[in-house]
Design a protein with these regions (language model features):
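Short boundary/loop segments of OB/S1/cold-shock single-stranded nucleic-acid-binding domains
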Residues: 1-15, 76-78
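Short, mixed charged/polar active-site loops
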Residues: 14, 37, 69
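Short aromatic-glycine-enriched beta-strand elements
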Residues: 25-30
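Short strand-coil-strand connectors
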Residues: 32-34
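A short macromolecule-binding patch
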Residues: 36-44
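Short nucleic-acid-contacting surface segments enriched for D/E, G, S/T with interspersed K/R
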Residues: 46-59
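OB-fold/S1-family single-stranded nucleic acid-binding modules
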Residues: 63-78
Length: 78
C-alpha cells in the first residue's frame, strides 16, 4: 500500500523538468517544464532536505493553489 498520495498517481500525471532557480533562504524556486515555469516551495521536495540545486532534474505533480499552478511532490531524479 502506498504511503504518500503522489505514489498513487499514474506516471502519466507526473511530469519532468529542471530546477532553474532556487532561493534557499526563502525556500522558493522554479521548475522549467518545456518552457512552462512552475513555482515550488521547499516543503514540496519529497526527500525532506528542503534544498535543491539549480540544474537538478526532477519529477513532480502540477497542482493549483490560490489560482496559481505550482509544482508539488518533487522527486530528484538520478
Amino acid at each position: 500500500m502506498p504511503t504518500h498520495w503522489w505514489s498513487m498517481m499514474s506516471e502519466a500525471e507526473r511530469r519532468t523538468g529542471t530546477v532553474i532557480d532556487f532561493d534557499e533562504h526563502v525556500g522558493l524556486g522554479h521548475i522549467d517544464h518545456g518552457g512552462d515555469q512552475l513555482l515550488f516551495h521547499c516543503v514540496e521536495i519529497v526527500d525532506g532536505t528542503r534544498t535543491i540545486s539549480v540544474g537538478t532534474s526532477v519529477s513532480f505533480v502540477v497542482v493549483t493553489r490560490f489560482g496559481v499552478r505550482e509544482a508539488s511532490a518533487i522527486d530528484k531524479l538520478a
